[in-house]
Each structure stands twice: as structure tokens, then as C-alpha cells.
Curated annotation (Swiss-Prot):
Domain of life: Eukaryota
Keyword annotations from UniProtKB, A to Z: Cytoplasm, Methyltransferase, Transferase
Enzyme class: transferase
The protein, known as: EEF1A lysine methyltransferase 1
Cell compartments where the protein resides: Cytoplasm
Any one Gene Ontology molecular-function term assigned to this protein's record: nucleic acid binding
Enzyme Commission numbers on file: 2.1.1.-
Annotated GO CC locations: cytoplasm
GO biological processes: peptidyl-lysine methylation
Catalytic activity: L-lysyl-[protein] + 3 S-adenosyl-L-methionine = N(6),N(6),N(6)-trimethyl-L-lysyl-[protein] + 3 S-adenosyl-L-homocysteine + 3 H(+)
Amino acid sequence: MSQFWYSEETASRLAEELLQQAGEHGRIACLSAPSVYQKLKQLESVRSDGVSAVLLEFDRRFAAYGDEFVFYDYNNPLCLPEDLLPQSFDIVIADPPYLSEECLSKVTLTVKHLTKGKILLCTGAIMEEHAGKLLDLKMCSFLPRHNHNLANEFRCYVNYESRLLS
């Protein structure tokens, strides 16, 4: 498994979207999206909205974030700590590690468990049909970029009214 880091502009745009959608004192779950989580942490010092974020990630190097890090393996999608209560996050961003229906189906279980409703999915354009079928998501016009260009076209999908749609 490889880590693909979003460009600075993309990480910022996604973090701003999450903060807006979470609302004051909201909770954000970053599922396999460490570059967005890191951007949220960077923005913490200039915000006073009380928003909190948790990173669910397979790469244990991110355990350096302490209690805000949760080890996550999509193969065990509901193997989560008891303190991650069902529907306890105002918005969940997910970036599944693989472009496969199997992976997205498993990640979907986690997303549905965690979210109160709002979902922002970042994955390949080839997953559009599955994103719609599994999570009722619509493709955004916003084009996320990575530090290194990916071979696959990458897109964002949401289930709410978003500035990323236009």
C-alpha cells in the first residue's frame, strides 16, 4: 500500500470544506486521509470553532498524534474503539486505499457507522457508480490534485450541498 499525498492546495480546500460542514464544535473523521488531517491540525492554531478531528489510518507512523489516531484496517471495517460511537461525527472524509468495489464496500461500513450523515469521498473516477450505489454520493466538479500525478483520474463525491460541486 502506498501513501499518495494531496497537493497543498487540495489539502487546504478539503480541510476548509470539512470545517465548514462540521460546524462549530463539530467532529470530523479522516478515514485514510492523513494529508487532510495534517492540514486540519495546521489550521487549528488560527481557528476558535472548537472543531475536533480524528485520523483513522493503517500507517502506524501517525500514532504520533496520540489519542487522535486510531489504527484502521479496511479489512476489519467495524473493528473500532468503543469510544468511536456510532453516528458521532458530523462529517467523514474517506480516501479508500484501493480502487476496488471490495475495498469501497468495506470502507462504506465504517463510514456509515461513524457519520451523522455528511460524507466526502475521495477516490478514482472509475468508482463513481459504486460511490453512488453504496453511499448515494454525487461527483463534484472540484478536481483533487496530488503531489505526484496519479495514473487514475481522481475525484471527490459528496451527499450534501457543497461548494466543491461547482
